[in-house]
Regions:
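Conserved SAM/SAH cofactor-binding pocket of Class I
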Residues: 92-194
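Mobile active-site "lid"/loop adjacent to the S-adenosyl-L-methionine
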Residues: 186-215
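Conserved AdoMet
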Residues: 28-103
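Non-catalytic accessory regions of SAM-dependent methyltransferases
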Residues: 1-42, 46
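Short helix-capping segments at alpha-helix termini
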Residues: 19-20, 132-133, 154-159, 226-227, ...
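Conserved hydrophobic residues forming the short capping helix/wall of the S-adenosyl-L-methionine
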Residues: 16, 105, 153, 223, ...
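Conserved Class I SAM-dependent methyltransferase catalytic core
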Residues: 211-271
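Residue-level signal for inorganic ion chemistry
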Residues: 29, 64, 94, 123, ...
Length: 273
């Protein structure tokens, strides 16, 4: 008798027990193998026969490949993004930046949005989806990231309002923006990371010198000229970096405030233009 979806998920959960999200991982992989949404699967597919394609997916996850890379997408804010090797996987923690912007701008929203280090397009495209009248620019040093972000913009119907191109932080940008979003690399070069991050996600998007602050040093002197009067900059930080980043920004004449994520950890520096 063929193994049921329910039983296969249970067995995979045990196999993936080294992951903090083993059950969720197994459910997402099974839904992908079935070609349905996870919620649909949980409501009506659990007693069906498990598909043969499930086992190879579990084996990939057991080798620490991120679920988002295996299934090819990740939800962020109100949108779903295609992701793959060479681009950082969006994290729920980064939604803190969008929450700060929504609190500040309300329904009216910003007119122009800048995303420095656009990656998959998560921050820029979430902002454009939130405010239908906004337009934006996203830049990244990675050609792979630019390619993936452009694909996401096209798939979400946002390409007409989003310009996405190669760029190194603010170099070559000579206009000001109402909303500036940035999730720069901020991990110390010697830091030990979980295998699914260390083995698969791009180091270019993770590491920022011996103290993790190199890219904040690059950003600090550029923010004032990029942020429009009355605008808002939301810049992600590591959980223990607020004092150091605030000091860097203060040295550049910027007055920042700390924004915490839903877990109560320092997650972003907020600067008003």
């Amino acid at each position: 008798m063929a193994e049921s979806v329910r039983a296969a998920i249970g067995r995979a959960t045990a196999l993936l027990s080294g992951s903090d999200s083993a059950r969720l991982d197994a459910e997402l992989l099974m839904a992908h193998a079935l070609g349905v949404e996870r919620g649909v699967m949980l409501l009506g597919w659990l007693d069906m026969a498990a598909p043969e394609g499930f086992e190879p997916l579990v084996a990939r996850r057991a080798a620490h490949e991120p679920v988002a890379y295996i299934i090819g997408h990740r939800d962020f804010w109100t949108i779903s993004l295609d992701v793959g090797p060479g681009v950082l996987i969006p994290r729920p923690d980064s939604e803190t930046l969008i929450e700060a912007a929504v609190d500040y701008f309300g329904k009216a929203g910003p007119a122009r949005v800048l995303d420095l280090g656009v990656g998959s397009g998560a921050l820029l495209l979430a902002a454009l989806a939130e405010w239908p009248n906004a337009t934006g620019l996203g830049v990244d040093r990675s050609a792979t990231a630019v390619h993936i972000a452009l694909g996401n913009a096209a798939r979400l119907g946002l390409l007409g309002r989003a310009t996405i191109r190669l760029g190194d932080w603010g170099d070559g940008i000579d206009e000001r923006f109402d909303l500036l979003l940035c999730n720069p690399p901020y991990i110390e070069g010697h830091a030990a990371l979980a295998p699914d991050v260390a083995l698969y996600e791009p180091g270019l998007a993770l590491f920022a010198g011996p103290d993790g602050l190199d890219d904040y040093r690059r950003l600090a002197p550029e923010l004032a000229r990029l942020l429009a009067p009355g605008g808002l900059a939301a810049i992600e930080i590591g959980a223990d970096q607020a004092p150091a980043v605030l000091a860097l920004f203060a040295a550049a004449g910027l007055d920042g405030a700390v924004r915490r994520d839903l877990a109560g950890r320092d997650r972003a520096i907020i600067i008003r233009g």
